[in-house]
Amino acid sequence: MAKGPVSTSSDDELPFETQEPIAADERSFFGGQPQKPSAPNARAALPASLAGQEHYHGHRERLRDRFREQGDAALADYEILELLLFRLIPRRDTKPIAKALIERFGSLAGVFGAPQALLMEVKGVGEAVALDLKLISTVAHRTLKSELRTKQVLSSWSSVIQYCHAAMAHETREQFRILFLDKRNVLIADEVQGRGTVDHTPVYPREVVKRALELSATAMVLVHNHPSGDPTPSRADIDMTKVIIDAAKALDITVHDHIIIGKDGHVSLKGLKLI
């Protein structure tokens, strides 16, 4: 009979029994520190696998201490991600995984915006970890959206851009989204009306206006992304926007703007005086 709890995960199985201080350490970001060896030469007597475990647990505590005492400004992006991965992958050195994710996707935003299938292409990231990363991304998006619901959209334009960028900038396919507003310009609904290819998504002006009527919306903000990263509008983007504006105007529905989101910025068709 085992004397203590033993890992049952095939990915994380260890050739030794898990000690209680380590288990307590993994229950939270700021759990108790692992027990120190009782004798100066105790580390030297440890098996190689145990010595490696002790090393990265010490690294985890140092990283937690820096975050606790100095905040996120003291940590690089990969270290923030590493802190998170401590919880998702509790018995493995997560620094190489965090660095590989940042290298593959370019930034924290890129990691959290990446599709699950692409996340799982990174060595060390399985389905469970990829799903957890997408869950965290969803929480962030919903937080930003909830802030929009309490504000007048036109007077909180920076919040609109921040939300749209978080939701769409790292999508690998074009996505056409509409923010439906009431007569006070408060958000009624945020809906994705279409998903397409890497450089095109079908848009049906009649369906756009029909949905606005169903929601009793009196105004809209159109948004779509360019997976290439360049938010410069195409002639098709401009023409399609004008068709929607004309269809909506006939029913007293205002189109305030059409925003195009890229990885590193955005473009407003109204700001460019194209509509």
From Swiss-Prot:
UniProt-recorded Gene Ontology molecular function terms: metal ion binding; metallopeptidase activity
InterPro entries reported for this sequence: MPN, RadC_JAB, RuvA_2-like, UPF0758, UPF0758_CS, UPF0758_N
SUPFAM superfamilies membership: JAB1/MPN domain, RuvA domain 2-like
Keywords: Hydrolase, Metal-binding, Metalloprotease, Protease, Zinc
Domain MPN: 153-275
Motif (JAMM motif): 224-237
Family: Belongs to the UPF0758 family.
NCBIfam families in the record: PRK00024.1, radc
Keyword Amino-acid biosynthesis: no
GO BP annotations listed: proteolysis
PANTHER family reported in the protein's UniProt record: DNA REPAIR PROTEIN RADC, UPF0758 PROTEIN YEES-RELATED
Positions of region (Disordered): 1-45
UniProt protein name: UPF0758 protein RL2068
CDD domains: MPN_DUF2466 (cd08071)
Binding site for Zn(2+): H224, H226, D237
